[in-house]
Every structure is written in structure tokens, then in C-alpha cells.
């Protein structure tokens, strides 16, 4: 459903056969979980156990979350009239969490995961010989100043109780081996994250202003390509309460955290939650020896999570359809 450009190093017999591609985030396991729930619900229906269930249940298998741009697979499905073709009163999504004990459920109402935007910056000066900097307009110095100034946005423009991140992933100026050349241009690549839509807007405004003015103060010009990615993921309070209730009934009080701290990572399911109420939750993939974070060449979805995730999906469907 959604592989990553990573060479798998798990040593499993079922490891990826495609060189340089692997399921490094567990989306194959998520697919198996939902298929397992579909099978369980079909068996319950055949046995007559669903006679008090009312309504229609839509199972959404959404690809391309790892795309990271243009709203990912979620926005593509929304734009393709997903909810007009398959109406939904509420929607729910789940992701495994390698840092949590196996089967433990974490969620929170409100903002749970950050927005994610990408920024490409090109600073242009006037290149020349390194021995004569006075005859140049050095874009490297301007870029270095921009890097430092960007850090003031979070510390001086964002509410201290808010959450925001501006990370510089790349700074490139000049070519290898050109020690005596002041380059014509410098490039920056940024990752920008926020847990509030207003903060997200503020970050874009200040980043654009600061880069322009800071570059001009050195005599350079700057172009900013600001690409909005996934929005803030906001869980609906009533849907979150329902997920928490079902999880506690399935696994017990000590296996549920209904007020988990917000996460700086991003998820395109947020685009679906902008048009339909619902809840996105995490289930522990296990934190024992050998476990590792997603997007790692040694990552493996823990198949021992399948029974718990299938049970969670089935119980949630039952609760929703009985409530109708």
C-alpha cells in the first residue's frame, strides 16, 4: 500500500523483494488489521450476531501517505469524492507506535499531530574571487544569517505555550573544491511544523518576511517556494471519547492513555478529519528488545499486534452501529 525508499535489513523470510523499497512504517500491517476486522465482522454477520447493528460500515484502504506533499493519498481520495460516494458520519484511523507497549492505545481530543510544510529558499548575490570579497555580494553569509534569524520566530513570535518547529534540513552554497570562489547563490530547505492552524499561518508569514528582509540587508535577493503539506490533525472530542471507551472495554484501564501528548510528526488522515468528524489513534507495536522506530531499515510490523488491532476495529464498529 505505501512503501518507502529504504533497503530492508530485517532478515525476515518475508522481507521485501524489491531492492531499495520496503514497508518501513507498518502500513502493510494496518491493511492486514482492517482486512482482519472485515473478516471478523463478516463472520459475526453470518452467525446472526449483528442483528442489532444498524447502518453502513465503510472500510477505507488509503495509499500514498508517505508522499508527504499535495495532501497525500488522503486528500486525493477526498478530492475524488470519497465521502460523496461513500457517505460517512464519522471516520477513524489507526497507526502502530513502536515506542509503546504492545497493544496499548494512545489518543487525545483536539490537536494530536502537527502540520507539515516544506520550504525551498534561493538566495542570490554576486559571485567572485574569494580574495576580493568586497567586490562580491556573498549569499553564503546572508544564508547563514537567515538560518540564525529563523530560530527567533519560534522563540519570539510564537506563543510560548504553543508548539512550533522550524528545522533547516539543508544549506548548500558553492561546489566541492571551490575554496577560493564566493558563489552566486545559496539554497536552504526547511521543515516547518505547528499544532495550531493560526500558528501555521503565522510561521509562513514570518518566514517569508524574514528571509526577504534579511537577504536584502546583505544586498541579496531571495525567492521562497512555500509548499503546504499535511494540515494539523485534530481529533473530534465525541469521537475521541468513543475510541477511549471502546479501548478501555477491550484492553483495560492501564492499556489506554486518552490524553497522550501531541506529536510533532504529521499524518495525511488530517485532511479527512477536516471534512468529517472522527479520531486518529495509536496502538503500541511493542517496545521490547529488537524494536525500532518506523522509517528504519530494521523496522518490522509486529504481527502480535494483529489480534488486538482486529479486536479494536471490530469492537469500535459494533459500538458505532449499535448506537445508531
Q: In which residue ranges do the predicted regions lie?
A:
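Cytochrome P450 catalytic-core helices
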Residues: 31-36
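Short acidic-aromatic active-site loops that bind/stabilize oxyanions
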Residues: 23-24, 303
